[in-house]
Design a protein with these regions (language model features):
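Flexible gly/pro-rich beta->alpha loop and the following alpha-helix that scaffold active-site loops
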Residues: 43-107
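Cofactor-binding loop segments of dinucleotide-utilizing enzymes, especially the Rossmann-like FAD-
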Residues: 27-29, 54, 111, 193
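Extreme N-terminal starter segment of soluble prokaryotic enzymes
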Residues: 20-25
Length: 262
């Protein structure tokens, strides 16, 4: 997990270098769930990331923060459907809406996908907390610039479920016919499950909260065997996601330095 000392460190470091780097603001909702294997793919492309942890007395990213993208993570037993709503739900929906209006790429994962859905005019339906191992099928050959696998596995640890607005495009469906990955606008993406999930993340979520999904022990054993497959499937997914969110393009930190020079 990222170990920056303050919420400003990654942004300060990225802008202080001779060749400024892109920085992603990551909203974390539980101690157990983080970017997981996605971290390695970002670091390998010289993309920094900074976690914001309102659940641990931290603050949400400010409106002025020069983030090149916003990632909203899952929330364990927290949801957005009215049963056990995330305490900072309203603020995060508004923050997401602001980032979308300014053109910043947004990626919502699990609960984060619900927040993104609400920010773009969709809704959320109540549903019990579940841990599901699913098979997803691509619905568009050009999804994620053609890098989304035709079929892939998805692990969903989530309460409630997003109900997409009509203008959203479903990029993949799970084997139950539900949206697994979807897109709204040019650069906002929702994932029902965390593509970078690790076995230890799910184990930590189970230990972190008193509420545990039904059949969690059985699903954990299945997930243990699935780890190498998930790791391989993440490679093309991250390639496409980084391209579609322009995270290899000129970072905001670089543009701000150019503006200061001018």
């Amino acid at each position: 997990m990222s170990d920056c000392k303050s919420t400003d460190d990654a942004f300060v470091l990225a802008s202080a270098e001779a060749d400024p780097m892109n920085v992603v603001a990551v909203l974390q909702h539980t101690a157990g769930e983080y970017l997981g294997r996605m971290e390695d793919h970002l670091e390998g492309r010289r993309i920094r990331f900074q976690y914001f942890r309102p659940f641990a007395a931290g603050k949400l990213p400010s409106a002025e923060l020069p983030a090149d993208a916003l990632i909203l993570l899952g929330g364990g037993p927290w949801g957005a459907g009215g049963t056990r709503d995330l305490p900072t739900l309203d603020e995060e929906v508004e923050l997401t809406r602001q980032r979308l209006e300014e053109g910043t790429p947004v990626v919502g994962i699990g609960l984060g996908a619900q927040i993104l859905c609400l920010a773009v005019g969709g809704s959320v339906e109540p549903r019990e907390l579940t841990l599901e191992l699913l098979t997803a099928t691509r619905t568009h050959d050009d999804a994620l610039n053609g890098f989304l696998p035709e079929t892939f596995n998805q692990v969903v640890y989530m309460r409630d479920w997003p109900v997409l607005p009509r203008h959203a495009t479903v990029l993949a469906e799970d084997n139950l016919g539900r949206p697994a990955i979807w897109q709204v606008g040019e650069n906002a993406y929702g994932f029902s499950g965390n593509p970078g999930i690790k076995l230890g993340m799910v184990e930590d979520l189970i230990m972190e909260f008193e509420e545990v999904p039904v059949d969690a022990a059985e699903q954990l054993e299945k997930l243990r065997a699935l780890q190498p497959v998930l790791e391989d499937e993440l490679v093309p997914i991250m390639t496409g996601l980084v391209q579609c969110t322009s995270l290899m393009s000129s970072p905001k930190a670089s543009r701000e330095l150019d503006a200061q020079v001018v």
